[in-house]
Amino acid sequence: MKYAAVLTTVAALASRALGAGVSGTAEGFASSATGGGSATAVYPTTTDELVSYLGDDEARVIVLSQTFDFTNTEGTTTETGCAPWGTGSACQVAINKDDWCTNYESSAPSTSVTYDNAGSLGITVNSNKSLIGEGTKGVIKGKGLRIVNGVENVIIQNIAVTDINPKYVWGGDAITINQADLVWIDHVTTARIGRQHYVLGTEADNRVTLSNNYIDGESDYSATCDGHHYWNVYLDGSSDKVTMKGNYFYKTSGRAPKVQGNTYLHAVNNYWNDNSNHAFEIGSGGYVLAEGNTFADVTAAVEDSSFEGELFSSSSDADTCSSYIGRACKANSFTNSGDLSGTTVDVLSKFKGETVATADTASTAPASNAGQGNL
């Protein structure tokens, strides 16, 4: 009887492993990402196992079925930081990372900061990995993920990354991509993050798709001191093609996204809800095609004062898109929000011949479809 029970358990575990895998395929620029492919799934049970699986050289399908809490695993640091945005209880304060306070905010009041060291640098993710959450169980708390230094072919789907030193700017990012290729992030929830929810660094990040993610900006602390997170999506690569489709931006106040460097961004069917400052910030080298997006209660859909890039988002010229991407563009929708009007046709030429995501009519669907647990 005991032998039979063991066999039953082994068979169940094997069936579970074989049944695990990525749901669907990416749209847009990272459409050929396969991650860990058909590798037999592994189920880490400790933070050390998770770090090992993500960082080794094997193609892997890694399934998260619990919370991995990195808080206090690397100790804490208490030192002097600064308060550039005010000393109110709802204001973020800054760590003096790389002498940032000293060099850039020397006139800001000094303040004592105590932060968790684990959040400062994310977990290294190597090539050919699929990181998948089981239901709503897969959570990484207190530490982010880093896809950097030549890594390629990574899929992250249906997990949550949360609680990375939310009081402290420079306290850590949720997902960092820098000098990488073929990265698909899908149905991921990020919440209560000190710095960026997503950051694509200054090296070439090539082909990236961010789809159906929930950027939850609600926080007790923010740089705008109003419970709306300012640091959200920062796209700064030297040769980047990014598809951003079906994402839900909630309670943000800026950099949602910030686009510059040499970045082609196709922003399609996203939903911005309750933004107290601005959504898009388009700097030099940012080329944005924005269509089928919904803006509700967004003070400014784009920040005019910093605009140095190029934008096509015109509903009146939507048919112009046909000559470049093979179909008319979808109109953006605005409710109690600033407008997003850009007619730079040169942007469309950047997307000609590229793998461009499909577009639906603008809607609020991402509010119920995006993030962990909504596959």
Swiss-Prot record:
GO terms for molecular function: pectate lyase activity; pectin lyase activity. Pfam families: Pectate_lyase_4. InterPro entries: Pec_lyase (IPR002022), Pectin_lyas_fold (IPR012334), Pectin_lyase_fold/virulence (IPR011050), PEL (IPR045032). Its EC number is 4.2.2.10. GO terms for cellular component: extracellular region. It catalyses: Eliminative cleavage of (1->4)-alpha-D-galacturonan methyl ester to give oligosaccharides with 4-deoxy-6-O-methyl-alpha-D-galact-4-enuronosyl groups at their non-reducing ends. Keywords: Carbohydrate metabolism, Cell wall biogenesis/degradation, Disulfide bond, Glycoprotein, Lyase, Polysaccharide degradation, Secreted, Signal. Optimum pH is 6.0. Stable over a wide pH range of 3.0 to 7.0. Belongs to the polysaccharide lyase 1 family. This is Pectin lyase 2. It comes from Aspergillus oryzae (strain ATCC 42149 / RIB 40).
